[in-house]
Amino acid sequence: MPKLGMQSIRRRQLIDATLEAINEVGMHDATIAQIARRAGVSTGIISHYFRDKNGLLEATMRDITSQLRDAVLNRLHALPQGSAEQRLQAIVGGNFDETQVSSAAMKAWLAFWASSMHQPMLYRLQQVSSRRLLSNLVSEFRRELPRHQAQEAGYGLAALIDGLWLRAALSGKPLDKPLAHSLTRHFITQHLPTD
């Protein structure tokens, strides 16, 4: 009889092992056997919880997108009466949270984006994540700007966030957070009306 609570522990072990494997060898070279070995379980456990490698990759990406959502929401909930500028910076901060800019997370996101072009479930996850970012940004800009300008500013800030993140991921170096925050802050202040 399985131990109570073991499913969540095993799932966490396997997702962490998947991130480690992707970080070291990439998504395509990360085998079920390697992931199982890293997690200290049999390959059958992966099949039991996730069906196959694609199921495990989907669960891993759901976990990373959930961490992103939590990082943003935690910052926004800390600013219930915050200005649009403060709340936009909170969204930026959530996107540059350590859970999203660690080497393992960055490599997983890159692999996820590439695979999403060919796998419908990953594509849907990618679209949800992108729409959530844009919706959050536009909503905050909308507090200060007409709809069309808010949409343009939201799209521009989303592109800046993604661009800064992508440049760091492809450089193999950690994201320069002070620079990223400075550039995004400048963008935000340029698009919000001055008092």
UniProtKB/Swiss-Prot annotation:
Residues 8-68 form the HTH tetR-type domain. GO terms for molecular function: DNA-binding transcription factor activity; transcription cis-regulatory region binding. One of its GO terms (biological process) is glycine betaine biosynthetic process from choline. PANTHER family: HTH-TYPE TRANSCRIPTIONAL REGULATOR BETI, HTH-TYPE TRANSCRIPTIONAL REGULATOR RUTR. Repressor involved in the biosynthesis of the osmoprotectant glycine betaine. It represses transcription of the choline transporter BetT and the genes of BetAB involved in the synthesis of glycine betaine. Gene3D superfamilies: Tetracycline Repressor, domain 2. InterPro entries: BetI_C (IPR039538), DNA-bd_HTH_TetR-type_CS (IPR023772), Homeodomain-like_sf (IPR009057), HTH-type_TetR-like_transc_reg (IPR050109), HTH_TetR (IPR001647), Tet_transcr_reg_TetR-rel_C_sf (IPR036271), Tscrpt_rep_BetI (IPR017757). It comes from the Bacteria. Residues 31-50 bind DNA. This is HTH-type transcriptional regulator BetI. Pathway: Amine and polyamine biosynthesis; betaine biosynthesis via choline pathway [regulation]. The keyword Transport does not apply. HAMAP family: HTH_type_BetI (MF_00768).
